[in-house]
């Protein structure tokens, strides 16, 4: 069999057409190397090629074996975890209808219906995003990130306000929540970092805009907690990129400057008058000043009287502000017992570990960084809500993925999860792109 016939037969067995060229090229190189070895033993060129092809084995069997490798995959473990978390969330809100006795209390029936609607919508979006090739983020990273920043800016100018805070931007009959879009900026930012590979100090100045502009815009919404979290995640992603040798800079000097800026950021915000008076007080509370709020004291009292298993009798939906958002874990504990909250946190932790494992084992550098970004968002939200529910941080408007009420929180969490599923799905299809470690340079 001729080499071109062999390669054609092999690639015909592989259903993923985008892999045909790379598979054919790899097999061709192997055949030519083997043929060269036969020629060194005295065999003429044509016969050497024929022998090399014959040693490759049956082309159909080879193609079928390669098809099993180079095809989209689904992370069943991750899908099961998300499904369990979604079901647990719906069970919790459904049970509140029973515990509340009167479904009209605090709009209990409304919250249950909203949770069902957004859980189903988010789950379907997750499956849709999973099927989309995540590499489009690398190709259109700046356009996507710029579009999200433009959306936030338009929200500031023409957005709908609720209690003095920008809620969302109305596009025709549809209201698009602004705060959900903030977290979708993170994977786009990770892709922007990828496009700056090989740059030196001068070439990286543009990254300052991509890093600080969204933080400034979020502060104006206003969203102090979200701005601090966003800045921390972006700097952490940038630090990973520096540590991986993506840029022609001194890692020590660059990381010292980056984290020095992070440490000085609160002082700069306080000193420049960027923050409103209530934001200053909130930042001071986070730094350890001030008395615990009513919500924090109520949450502590609910936890103190909770049981290991079973309802405590505390009607948290009546007396705890944020019972279905930032204090959702306290509500779970009051309704079902401490084990229920531990189960929820454990499932979220397992999901994050799985997401981080998928990201860290990517040969494709873009997939690795985007996966890290998605994982960090879910970890930061879950971790802050956990420590806040334990009384270790003051009360703040932070939501926990999949559980806290609100369509923007639900949908953004599912989309970020879908991106990680997409990274896993295409792990054996998109080529790896190892980055050579850069050395510091004075100019680009």
Which stretches of residues belong to each language-model region?
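Hydrophobic alpha-helical transmembrane segments
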Residues: 117-125, 334-355
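Loop-to-helix entry and N-terminal half of a specific, functionally important transmembrane alpha helix
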Residues: 358-397, 403
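Soluble N-terminal domains of membrane-associated systems
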Residues: 1-79, 83
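A structural signal for hydrophobic alpha-helical transmembrane segments in multi-pass membrane proteins
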Residues: 50-163, 343, 375, 410-439, ...
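Hydrophobic alpha-helical segments of polytopic membrane proteins
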Residues: 205-214, 225-271
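Hydrophobic, glycine- and aromatic-enriched re-entrant/interface helices and adjoining loop segments
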Residues: 250-343
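Transmembrane alpha-helical segments and their membrane-water interfaces
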Residues: 110-137, 184-198, 236-246, 353-354
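Membrane-interfacial helix-loop-helix modules of multi-pass inner-membrane proteins that assemble, modify
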Residues: 154-176, 277-285
């Amino acid at each position: 069999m001729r080499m071109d016939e062999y390669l054609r037969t092999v690639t015909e067995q592989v259903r993923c057409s985008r892999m045909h060229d790379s598979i054919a090229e790899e097999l061709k190189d192997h055949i030519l190397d083997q043929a060269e070895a036969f020629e060194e033993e005295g065999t003429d060129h044509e016969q050497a090629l024929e022998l090399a092809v014959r040693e490759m084995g049956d082309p159909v069997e080879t193609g079928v074996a390669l098809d099993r490798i180079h095809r989209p995959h689904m992370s069943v473990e991750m899908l099961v975890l998300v499904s369990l978390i979604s079901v647990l969330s719906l069970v919790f809100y459904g049970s509140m209808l029973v515990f509340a006795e009167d479904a009209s209390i605090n709009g209990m029936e409304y919250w249950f219906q909203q949770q069902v609607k957004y859980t189903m919508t988010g789950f379907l979006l997750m499956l849709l995003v999973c099927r989309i090739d995540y590499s489009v983020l690398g190709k259109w990273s700046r356009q996507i990130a710029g579009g999200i920043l433009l959306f936030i800016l338009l929200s500031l100018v023409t957005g709908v306000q609720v209690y003095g805070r920008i809620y969302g931007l109305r596009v025709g009959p549809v209201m698009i929540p602004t705060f959900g879009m903030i977290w979708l900026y993170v994977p786009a930012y990770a892709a922007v970092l990828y496009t700056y590979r090989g740059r030196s100090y001068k070439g990286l100045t543009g990254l300052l805009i991509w890093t600080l502009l969204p933080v400034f815009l979020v502060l104006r919404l206003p969203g102090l907690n979200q701005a601090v979290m966003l800045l921390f995640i972006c700097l952490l992603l940038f630090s990973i990129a520096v540590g991986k040798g993506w840029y022609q800079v001194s890692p020590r000097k660059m990381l010292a400057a980056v984290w020095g800026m992070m440490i000085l950021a609160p002082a700069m915000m306080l000193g420049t008058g960027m923050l409103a008076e209530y934001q200053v007080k909130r930042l001071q509370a986070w730094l350890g000043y001030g008395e615990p709020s009513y919500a924090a004291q109520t949450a502590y009292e609910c936890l103190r009287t909770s049981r290991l298993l079973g309802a405590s009798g505390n009607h948290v939906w009546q007396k705890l502000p944020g019972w279905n958002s930032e204090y959702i874990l306290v509500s779970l504990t009051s309704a079902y017992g401490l084990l229920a909250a531990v189960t929820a946190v454990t499932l979220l932790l397992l999901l994050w570990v799985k997401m981080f494992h998928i990201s860290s084992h990517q040969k494709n550098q873009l997939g690795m960084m985007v996966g890290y970004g998605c994982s960090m968002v879910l970890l930061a939200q879950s971790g802050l809500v956990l420590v806040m529910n334990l009384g270790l941080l003051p009360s703040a408007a932070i939501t926990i993925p999949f559980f806290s009420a609100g369509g923007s929180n639900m949908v953004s969490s599912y989309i970020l999860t879908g991106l990680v599923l997409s990274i896993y799905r295409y792990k054996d299809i998109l080529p790896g792109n190892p980055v050579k470690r850069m050395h510091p340079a004075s100019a680009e």
